[in-house]
Amino acid sequence: MKIIKLLAFAALCFPLVASAIDGVELLKKVDRNLEPESYESYRKLINIEPNGAKKEFVIYSVKKGRDQTASLFLSPSSDKGRSTLRQGDNMWLYIPNVGKPMRITSLQSVTGGVFNNADIMRLDYAVEYDVKSAEDKGDHFLLDLKAKTGEVAYDKLMMKVDKKLILPTEIEAYASSGMLMKTLRFKDIKDFGGGIKRPATIETDSPLYKDYKSVMLYSGLKKKDFPDEVFTQGFMSRLEELRK
């Protein structure tokens, strides 16, 4: 009789154990569903001012592994040829005919909009954040993410994850003071081929920049491998070669 009772108790408890959310694995899946570990992409960034005025940038980006990324500005003409490089927490901006690459920070913005450099040169979320908690909210999962170091642009992220697609739908980014810095919304699921199906649009706004808005539109994204040389300061002036 005791054995039967123990088996019955175990059967009741098993669904609770099985339903527990592994937040670390969930975040890793989010990273890989958003992008392959190594890839190339084409994006348009649009900054929208309160009066409706817009400024657009077209950017070619490449990434290798979890913490190396480089980007080349294709337009507007005033920015064409500029490039950025990120290795972990270190970032550089190269401007043609100005000299050697200059250091930049994650909270600055090479495009001058609501997206900062950390957004534009994003690494895997699992590289920069630990999972504090993961909750099942019925129609979505909610991940509470804490920055691993003080070098990360945001101290905390609250990420809503679509249960079926395991992709983010909304991220609130907070400073260490608890102040909301910005909200990012992921929209327009698109099949890019090669098994990549993700939001093609990311919109952001911030209480720090009232009535300003920035939009990131992905037009191309595919898995591609690159040599380590691509992710060095010496290659920043040669990124155009990757497109030939």
Residues covered by each model-derived region:
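Sec-dependent signal peptide recognition
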Residues: 2-9
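N-terminal signal peptide c-region/cleavage motif recognized by signal peptidases
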Residues: 13-17
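Flexible, processing/modification-adjacent segments and terminal tails
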Residues: 20-38, 44-46, 53-55, 79-155, ...
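Short, solvent-exposed loop/turn elements at beta->coil junctions and helix N-caps
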Residues: 46-49, 189
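A short, sequence-level motif marking secondary-structure junctions
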Residues: 61-65, 87-88, 107-111, 187-190, ...
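N-terminal post-signal-peptidase region of extra-cytosolic proteins
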Residues: 70-79
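Gly/Pro-enriched, hydrophobic low-complexity segments
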Residues: 122, 138-233
